[in-house]
Amino acid sequence: MLFRSPKSRELLDSIHAGTQEEIRLRARMMASVDEGVGMILDVLEKKGELDNTCIIFLGDNGYFFGEHGLGPERRFAYEEGIRSPFLVRYPKLIKAGTRKKDLLICQDIAPTLIQLAGGKPGPQIQGRSILPLLSKKPVKWRKAVLAEYWAEQAYPWLIGMTYKAIRTDRYKLIHWVNRGRDGELDELYDLEKDPFELKNLIRSKPHAPIREKLHRDLKLLVAEAVGL
């Protein structure tokens, strides 16, 4: 058996050791980022501009270290890959400790900053300004976001990994573009009951209406993503 093979154990041990070292390196990197952010805040405070500056802190993606049997990796549509920190400090508009559960995407940053600067985002700008979310008035906001990865001819080990996914406040559907037939390898998760995405509901009959709606909504999001 595989786990009894000395060569297999040697290979697995080397992968584990490499992963542990990468975790340590990433921890050091984050500590360095934290120090850098602190230095920026110190300079702004000394110049008297700290509370007059909108500071947005976010990550471009998450990372896997064993979740879903992956790691180190970041390209998949599971929560560890697509859900990342998004923090804003701007005392003029945002009270400290405010938390929002609305679905944001990185494309929302540009129109937000344009509006903060007194401008009006043009029709070619993707994303939406998040400033309306900071008001106390009810706001009609997006109900789902699109996540996708195009892997063909990128790296040999990633061929066939192209996917398009839709995430709502509760569900996620991952459609593997070049795997299986008629979406038989697609994945559907109830993030409320299964936050770690361990139970694929794609073939669950009770969830068939949800699956079909998500498929339709995914097509609409892809169509709206001009050029993608």
For each predicted feature, which ranges?
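Active-site-proximal cap/lid insertion segments
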Residues: 1-104, 116-124, 175, 179-182, ...
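C-terminal cap/loop subdomain of S1 sulfatases and analogous C-terminal strand-loop tails that border
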Residues: 61-67, 102, 107-110, 115-191, ...
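A general structural motif at alpha-helix termini
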Residues: 134, 202-205
